Amino acid sequence: MFVDYEFYKETFKGKLSEEEFDKFVNLSCMKITKETCSRVTDGTLNNFPNELILDIKTCVCALIDKLKIFQDAIDTASNFKQEKIVKSQTAGAVSVTYDTSFSSYFLDSKNQEIQIKSIINACLCPRCINGKFYNLLSKVIENSNSCKTCSLV
C-alpha cells in the first residue's frame, strides 16, 4: 500500500471515512503498478525522490476518490430498480422514461478507464528531478539516468 489513511485525510484532504478508504486503496495501488509496468510497487516506492513519492501518493488518493464515485454510481443504478426516478411520462398509451443519465455516464467501463488513465497521466507525467529523468508511464523499460532537458538549464 503506497499511502495510509493519515496521508489521505491530512495531506490530500480526502473526505472518505477510513472504512471507505480501505475499500479502494489496494485497487488504486494496483492500477498504478499496472500502468507503470511495475516500476511503482511497495518494494520500489522508496527508491524515488520525495517529490515523486508525493505525486504517487496523491495519485493513489485521487484514484480512491474516483473509484468511490464509480461505486456510488453502481449503488445508485441498483437503487433505480427499487426507487426509479421518472424523467418523463405520457398518459396516452402509457410511456414512462426513467432518468439514468448520471449513473450511466459513470457505469460505462470505457469511460471509467479513460478517467482513471487521465488521473494517472496527470499525476505521473514524465519529468526531470535533480537532473534525473523519470518516465514511470513509458511502456519501454530503459535505464536513462541523465536528463537532456535538465542539463540544458
Q: Could you say what each language-model-derived stretch is?
A:
Residues 1-153:
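Divalent metal-cofactor coordination and adjacent catalytic microenvironments
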